[in-house]
Amino acid sequence: MTLEHQFDYDAIIIGSGPGGEGAAMGLAKHGAKIAVIERHYNVGGGCTHWGTIPSKALRHAVSRIIEFNQNPLYSDNSRIIRSSFSDILRHADSVIGQQTRMRQGFYERNQCELFSGEASFIDAHTIAVHYPDNTHETLTAANIIIATGSRPYHPAEVDFNHPRIYDSDSILQLDHEPQHVIIYGAGVIGCEYASIFRGLSVKVDLINTRDRLLAFLDQEMSDALSYHFWNNGVVIRHNEEFDSIEGLSDGVIVNLKSGKKMKADCLLYANGRTGNTETLGLENIGLSTDSRGQLKVNSMYQTALAHIYAIGDVIGYPSLASAAYDQGRLAAQAIIKGDASAHLIEDIPTGIYTIPEISSVGKTEQELTAMKVPYEVGRAQFKHLARAQIVGMNVGSLKILFHRETKQILGIHCFGERAAEIIHIGQAIMEQKGEGNTIEYFVNTTFNYPTMAEAYRVAALNGLNRLF
């Protein structure tokens, strides 16, 4: 790729999260001259520092504590491992450090120039980089990619400066040991932190603004999570919204519109996210966002200005780190070739890192029923698998939805430990074209034994035996 001489760079990428990294690597591999602007002092974006990586590291530490305390091999009922939130945060910090160093190396090896400052548009090809010491410099580029991510949504009536009111970013600076937590918002983030806190024996009240947990999931998966939370002592309030939130010296009171009142040591507000666009100076180039700070793009991730692209959380759905990386790669392809021949896959897998995990890909039973598709269900319970019995992972199941006539796999849903890994075995077959996508593959192939992957053979046999 040859540099257009009137510009400093072929492309400027604003943000170094998964989307920015995918774009930078895609462009650099084709010889483009790249500048990456990151306002945080380290690369990685929200995914590495406040979102995916720390929350999953916390979850892993908690799940291992639970496993130890429940395993009769280690536990004799006289000793129980207990750990505080601040203790397990140290594990998360270690992982964040490893991730940051690795990603810093990616940029350095690919000769991407990094600028640590706040970016804003001066005009459609010029970016000002504002540094913490109040100095600034300007950079120009033929193409600009906005990959600034998102942050927790802050309603004006909630005082997030109060020391007992947290969002999903600031919760990582929790400096006391709560005995009781209220989590407002039962989306993915809210449910994951409900699992983490309950796993640390903290009392958890989960306020859900909808009528069931994670309504986008297959209903059986949603119901399984609800039951598991209930069985572990999480109190869930469905169809509730806050009227007011009062911060106290030693806690917080949440007044609900239904008239209920709830009190706890602290509140985690986890209801919605907002695109990081307010400081970009978009008004200087004629771009505007929706009410949640998100930009509209076409199939090649171009905004209303063809040389300015947007990817990742800043464009909304699907708001997944995995998808953001692919979007960055596709935007790079569009810049290099003038067109993005590839697109995100239709069925993007979802991984939810509650305890136990949930993962799904493809259609739910509710969607197939509404579409009047003649499908059948194959199920495997983890408790019937030798590997699950050996490692003590008896809670969980795998469900395969397939067409009764063609045997084509239509959806896969998994609840249980390692679900986010297990799902990809089925996804690989489901993504095959034509006759390659068939549930009979799992009957006709040979699995290692004992493995969790064997659940696919059990579920396939279960489903095929239902046909007549």
From Swiss-Prot:
It is found in: Cytoplasm. Keywords: Cytoplasm, FAD, Flavoprotein, NAD, NADP, Oxidoreductase. FAD binds at E38, R39, H40, Y41, N42, V43, G44, G45, G46, C47. Binds 1 FAD per subunit. It holds the Pfam family Pyr_redox_dim. InterPro entries: Class-I_Pyr_Nuc-Dis_Oxidored (IPR050151), FAD/NAD-bd_sf (IPR036188), FAD/NAD-binding_dom (IPR023753), FAD/NAD-linked_Rdtase_dimer_sf (IPR016156), Pyr_nuc-diS_OxRdtase (IPR001100), Pyr_nucl-diS_OxRdtase_dimer (IPR004099), STH_gammaproteobact (IPR022962). SUPFAM superfamilies: FAD/NAD(P)-binding domain, FAD/NAD-linked reductases, dimerisation (C-terminal) domain. Its main location: cytoplasm. Its EC number is 1.6.1.1. Its cofactor is FAD. It catalyses: NAD(+) + NADPH = NADH + NADP(+). The keyword Transmembrane helix does not apply. One of its GO terms (cellular component) is cytosol. The keyword NADP applies. One of its GO terms (biological process) is 2-oxoglutarate metabolic process. Belongs to the class-I pyridine nucleotide-disulfide oxidoreductase family. Conversion of NADPH, generated by peripheral catabolic pathways, to NADH, which can enter the respiratory chain for energy generation. This is Soluble pyridine nucleotide transhydrogenase. The lineage of its organism: Bacteria, Pseudomonadati, Pseudomonadota, Gammaproteobacteria, Enterobacterales. The gene is sthA.
